[in-house]
């Protein structure tokens, strides 16, 4: 069963969908930079329910059905969105799944402050870890003032002013929960070498799987493998 929620934050709302299961285990999904909660996130949530997890997908403000403008959605804002969603459901235990930039949100949200509402584990697909991934975009913004991805998505200097506050070393210094990373060898957006470096730097246990021939977007075969391995790994690290 699914139920839509509108979660308030700063006078705006975050469009959220809860896929319910008869369990105290929860899995929250964070979408990528210019993505939203539809498509693969819906079917990932359905698989999570089959595996006995309450699953939650949501749109960061400025994306999908949530309020706000994308150009105003900084990393700080996305972290606040994730925390608001988790706090709304008050899970006693949960894991985070982040794809691409959604993984960076998950890492920094989890690594900032350890509390009763911190995740037990993090799953990251093709994760943005080191800020250098956005260096080319920053250069465009410095030269032109704005970078437009399409009619609905653009960033300006505000994004990078905020982004600079979140080096990946702040995660490696504070995060100690188990992490699983799944990354394609031919990723054209985020080089897989970043994930090898991140895995070596993280303090907790790390599973890192290289998907040979896969790019930033996974094929259907790789997506199926990702889901299978995700829940096998969760079963091995979560009591």
Residue ranges of model-derived segments:
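N-terminal cap/lid segment of alpha/beta-hydrolase-fold proteins
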Residues: 1-22
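Catalytic histidine-centered segment of alpha/beta-hydrolase-like enzymes
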Residues: 214-227
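Conserved alpha/beta-hydrolase
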Residues: 48-67
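Alpha/beta-hydrolase active-site loop
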Residues: 72-90
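Hydrolase active-site cap/lid region
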Residues: 115-155
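Short beta-strand element of the alpha/beta-hydrolase
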Residues: 24-32
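Short beta-strand/loop motif that positions the catalytic acidic residue
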Residues: 174-176, 181-183, 187
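The serine-hydrolase catalytic nucleophile loop
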Residues: 33-46, 193
């Amino acid at each position: 069963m699914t139920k839509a929620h509108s979660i308030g934050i700063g006078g705006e709302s975050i469009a959220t969908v809860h896929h319910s299961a008869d369990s105290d285990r929860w899995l929250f999904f964070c979408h990528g930079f210019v993505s939203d909660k539809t498509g693969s996130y819906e079917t990932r949530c359905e698989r999570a329910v089959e595996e006995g997890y309450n699953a939650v997908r949501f749109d960061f403000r400025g994306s999908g059905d949530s309020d706000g403008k994308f150009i105003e959605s900084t990393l700080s804002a996305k972290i606040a969105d994730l925390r608001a969603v988790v706090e709304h459901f008050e899970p006693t235990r949960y894991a985070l799944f982040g794809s691409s930039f959604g993984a960076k949100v998950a890492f920094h949200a989890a690594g900032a402050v350890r509390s009763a509402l911190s995740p037990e584990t993090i799953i990251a697909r093709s994760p943005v870890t080191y800020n250098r991934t956005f260096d080319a975009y920053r250069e465009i913004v410095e030269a032109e003032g704005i970078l437009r991805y399409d009619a609905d998505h653009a960033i300006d200097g505000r994004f990078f002013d905020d982004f600079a506050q979140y080096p990946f070393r702040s995660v490696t210094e504070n995060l100690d929960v188990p992490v699983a990373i799944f990354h394609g060898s031919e990723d054209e957006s985020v080089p897989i070498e970043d994930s090898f470096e991140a895995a070596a730097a993280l303090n907790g246990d790390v599973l890192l799987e290289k998907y040979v021939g896969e790019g930033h977007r996974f094929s259907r075969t790789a997506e199926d493998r990702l889901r299978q391995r995700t829940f096998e790994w969760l079963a091995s690290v979560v009591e």
